[in-house]
From Swiss-Prot:
Keywords: Cell membrane, Membrane, Transmembrane, Transmembrane helix. The chain crosses the membrane at residues 5-25, 53-73, 86-106, 116-136. It comes from the Bacteria. It is found in: Cell membrane. HAMAP family: UPF0756 (MF_01874). This is UPF0756 membrane protein GTNG_2661. Belongs to the UPF0756 family. It is a multi-pass membrane protein. GO terms for cellular component: plasma membrane.
């Protein structure tokens, strides 16, 4: 057994112990790709474009209430009348700008990716975190909203 498979199996065990379905599914997909000998064809594309695909799926999920009619112009205009909505808007902009800096950092120092991956795996598997950047903005906005409500 080679090192990548052993590493993935270790992470799978952590995912099972932590009962983290997303981590388990992700590792199962990667192990299946390796098992069927598709890694040379699929993994470079997943590595290069996977984050963008994930953000696209999350964006579709976030926009689904617009498509179903749950959120329309009336709700949008109404929401912008609250301080919470303005905080969320500002943090959406802030996180997008921070992500730009993160992309530049990873491009200039690819070795930092290993630490990033390890930190993400630890957060996802042990602390039930979510490996999704845009949700960080919502989390920060939530904290600030609670602080504004408190004071």
């Amino acid at each position: 057994m080679n090192e990548p498979v052993l590493f993935l199996l270790l992470l799978l065990a952590i995912g099972v112990i932590a009962k983290n379905q997303s981590l388990i599914i992700a590792i199962a997909v990667l192990l299946a790709i390796k098992l069927f000998g598709l890694e040379a064809r699929l993994l470079p594309a997943i590595q290069a474009k996977g984050i963008n695909w994930g953000v696209t799926v999350i964006t579709v999920a976030v926009l689904a209430p617009i498509a179903t009619g749950e959120i329309g112009f009336k709700q949008l205009i109404g929401s912008l009348q609250s301080a919470s909505a303005w905080i969320a808007l500002l943090f959406g902009i802030f996180v997008a700008l921070i992500a730009k800096g993160g992309v530049m950092l990873l491009a200039s120092d690819p070795h930092i990716t290993a630490s990033l991956v390890l930190g993400t795996v630890i957060a996802v598997s042990l602390f039930h975190g979510v490996a999704v950047g845009p949700l960080i903005g919502a989390g920060i906005a939530y904290v600030v909203i609670k602080m504004v409500e408190y004071f």
